[in-house]
A protein has these predicted regions:
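Cleavable N-terminal export/targeting peptides
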Residues: 1-34, 287-290
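Outer-envelope beta-barrel architecture signal
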Residues: 5, 30-38, 118-122, 178-184, ...
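Transmembrane beta-strands of outer-membrane beta-barrel pores
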Residues: 42-48, 126-132, 172-174, 188-194, ...
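Membrane-embedded beta-strands that build the outer-membrane beta-barrel scaffold
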Residues: 110-112, 122-126, 170, 239, ...
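Predominantly the C-terminal beta-signal and adjacent terminal strand-loop region
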Residues: 235-290
Length: 290
């Protein structure tokens, strides 16, 4: 987690707590907390890295160019050589990205629940995150003389996607009503992934490799095929603490979700764990606490 993201989370957490402490909720029996509640979520998504291999440039689907074939197109070669110089006239791809992975990302969203009493609630969340993935590939070309070692240059290839999670769950409080409590929550989860781009940069030139393919007999044209939004159903569970105030509840929890994401035909669609620590500030609009 970067220092910038840590600072953002701490500032928001402080603002939430200060706002919620204006009025404390009188603690009573289980019926004191009842009715509809709405709120905001902010978390830090740590996704499973396996689906990210869609963006690493390695051979995937027939008919689409992998990184090696893309760099081998004569007009792409001309552009790369113009950037790197004539010394790179005989360049080749030396190494595909290794250990390709997502970067962790900030996730934000909304929350709604119906609280039956202090102990039981039905909850729903919708969270959004923009994920970026990155890896390094290596280009090799001969040295300036036949006696020198080959020259290796490294470049970054990246992918970017929007991910949405929609969950419907059941929350149960573990223990008697209190200003400080522990809760367990679980339920089904719908995940949707919208791929935005897959590209790399050499010098000032950016190349899009997202489902790149040649155009018929055209010798110098490439197009990028579209990829539809990928959706799947999984599940989640979370364990956390909650602070109770007059009309506010502040949840602090760790959510573990099992999501079945496959971004290309050859990728196995299996449940993979994703982790998300988060804060959730909820305000009670109706019921006994108002």
């Amino acid at each position: 987690m970067s220092k910038k993201h840590i600072l953002i989370l701490l500032c928001l957490w402080h603002a939430m707590v200060v706002s919620a402490q204006d009025e404390e909720r009188p603690i009573g029996g289980p019926s004191e907390k009842k009715g509809f509640m709405f709120g905001l979520n902010i978390g830090y998504l740590m996704p499973n890295d396996e689906p990210a291999t869609f963006y690493d440039g390695k051979p995937k689907e027939q008919g689409f160019l992998d990184l090696n074939a893309f760099l081998g197109q004569w007009f792409i070669r001309d552009q790369v050589i113009n950037t790197l110089g004539d010394r790179a006239a005989n360049y080749r791809l030396s190494e595909y990205p290794q250990d390709y992975r997502y970067n962790n990302a900030l996730a934000i969203g909304g929350h709604v629940r119906y609280q039956f009493n202090w102990t039981h609630a039905v909850v729903a969340d919708m969270n959004f995150a923009r994920l970026r993935s990155a890896g390094i590939f290596v280009i090799e070309y001969p040295g300036t003389t036949g006696l020198t070692q080959p020259v290796f240059e490294s470049f970054e290839i990246t992918g970017e996607e929007d991910r949405m999670n929609l969950s419907l769950g059941y929350q149960v409080a573990l223990g008697a009503p209190s200003e400080f409590g522990v809760h367990l929550e679980f339920g089904p989860l719908l995940t949707s992934v919208n791929v935005r781009n897959n590209q790399f940069r050499i010098g000032d030139q950016t190349y899009s490799i997202l489902r790149a393919q040649t155009v018929g007999q055209a010798p110098d044209q490439l197009i990028n095929g579209q990829i539809t939004t990928v959706s799947s159903v999984g599940g989640y569970g979370q364990l956390g603490t909650n602070l109770e105030f007059h009309k506010f509840t502040l949840d602090m929890a760790l959510r573990v979700s099992l999501e079945k994401i496959a971004l290309y035909a050859g990728q196995e669609a299996k449940f993979r764990p994703n982790y998300q620590p988060f804060l959730r500030l909820i305000y009670q609009l109706s019921g006994s606490g108002s």
